[in-house]
């Protein structure tokens, strides 16, 4: 599992991130929810991002890349997928609140 979360500990986003988010909000629709151009563009961008992440981490299959809405959801998915009731897990005070 690879976990990326710096939103809780960093300052404001760089201008390039702000610009990219604004562009996506202007030009993309709900992926997978329609056959209109904005929806198809969003679906393509998401799949291209999956491909790039898959290549970066040598996963082999872009569909192995999962996106979630936030850190808590990601951690819950990983924890519930890895551990069963009764398992013993040791953490530190540095872990995310959901852990």
Can you say where each PLM-predicted feature lies in the sequence?
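Pyridoxal 5′-phosphate
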Residues: 1-99
């Amino acid at each position: 599992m690879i976990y990326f979360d710096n939103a809780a500990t960093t300052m404001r986003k760089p201008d390039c991130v702000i610009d990219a988010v604004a562009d996506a909000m202007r030009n993309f629709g709900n992926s997978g929810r329609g056959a209109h151009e904005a929806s198809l563009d969003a679906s393509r961008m998401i799949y291209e991002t999956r491909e790039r992440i898959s290549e970066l981490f040598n996963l082999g299959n872009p569909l192995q890349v999962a996106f979630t809405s936030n850190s808590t959801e990601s951690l819950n998915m990983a924890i519930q997928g890895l551990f069963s009731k009764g398992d013993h897990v040791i953490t530190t005070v540095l872990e995310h609140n959901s852990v």
